Amino acid sequence: RTSGEVNVPVIWLFEQTLTVGAEWNRDELNDPSSTSLTVKDSNIAGIPGSAANRSSKNKSEISALYVEDNIEPMAGTNIIPGLRFDYLSESGSNFSPSLNLSQELGEYVKVKAGIARAFKAPNLYQTSEGYLLYSKGNGCPKDITSGGCYLVGNKNLDPEISINKEIGLEFTVDDYHASVTYFRNDYQNKIVAGDQIIGRSASGAYVLQWQNGGKALIEGIEASMAVPLMPDRLNWNTNATYMIASEQKDTGNPLSIIPKYTVNTFLDWTITSALSANVNWTLYGKQKPRTHAESRSEETKGLSGKALGAYSLVGANVNYDINKNLRLNVGISNIFDKQIYRSAEGANTYNEPGRAYYAGVTASF
């Protein structure tokens, strides 16, 4: 991966700063283990059934050029148009325009707004025709009522596209800071495990393929606050996110099971020039499960409506600079030993480990 950019001041009509940059990225996959599935069939939808005849390798390259112009037509006003061009070795060209606005409203308040088109390229497993994933049945789409199924790579996948919008207010007085931002991201071409049968293997298993699916939406509000309780000694910082929506448009299922709200608050204490301490508290809101069955297992066994209730975690750590090159760190996470165990019910999709102690040394040169 390599990148570079140059900033050029421009005096033409208004004060401007022009940014021009370029990026290049190459990803390579060589995973014999994940592509080693061998089946009795001679081929699966044109893909050799024998692992020896399928490549375990894949690669992709992305080359990009971008330009951004920070225009200040008057004091306190900034208009920032931008354009990014990406060329993907697998799927071709993509243009991503953007427009951001910042306007001061008096001495302490600023309003910001922006809109941008963005994309996400498929990963190498999703585009690798050598990668085969097999389910005996429970992981197959609900409309496949018997037998197993294969999920195969698709070299013709298009990138996921999103239109991202936000608008917010910032308030700053000396070292006090507060902000609130509304955001909405509309997605198209979401890459999903396909539910359309593209063929059957010689043994009768259904063949499916990664595909570009329907639309999705993420919408919410973010807020932050910074308060210097004792300037240069004790600072209190808080950020929070409230999710209005996070769903697949076609099913209403959440894109992922996440808290309705999350609050992080930190108390940073600079005790001496070498010694500092931090106490942190995180609150996770209620998490609701999926409501629409997508797999055979969910269809036959039914979906649990069990939600995961709100909970919080507390941690603390201490840092000590032994010298300018060496730092010591010790701490405790999840001080009150809150534990959650993953189960097959509803929103209980992950483990929350209990109390943990840690220590580390960082050397810098």
Predicted regions and their residues:
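Face-selective signature of the C-terminal outer-membrane beta-barrel domain
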Residues: R1-S91, S102-G106, S179, R233-N239
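Residues that define the transmembrane beta-barrel architecture of outer-membrane proteins
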Residues: T2, K59-S63, S93-F95, I161-K165, ...
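Residue-level signature of outer-membrane beta-barrel architecture
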Residues: V6-W12, N70-P73, F85, S93, ...
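Transmembrane beta-strands of outer-membrane beta-barrel proteins
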Residues: Q16-A22, I79-P81, V111-A113, A178-V180, ...
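Transmembrane beta-strands of outer-membrane beta-barrel pores
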Residues: W24-N30, E61-S63, L83-S89, I115-A121, ...
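Membrane-embedded beta-barrel scaffold of Gram-negative outer-membrane proteins
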Residues: N30, E104-K112, K142-C149, N154-Q211, ...
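Gram-negative outer-membrane beta-barrel transporters
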Residues: E72-I79, S179-Y187, A202-A293, K324, ...
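C-terminal beta-signal and adjacent terminal beta-strands/loops
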Residues: F119, Q188, A193, L283-S297, ...
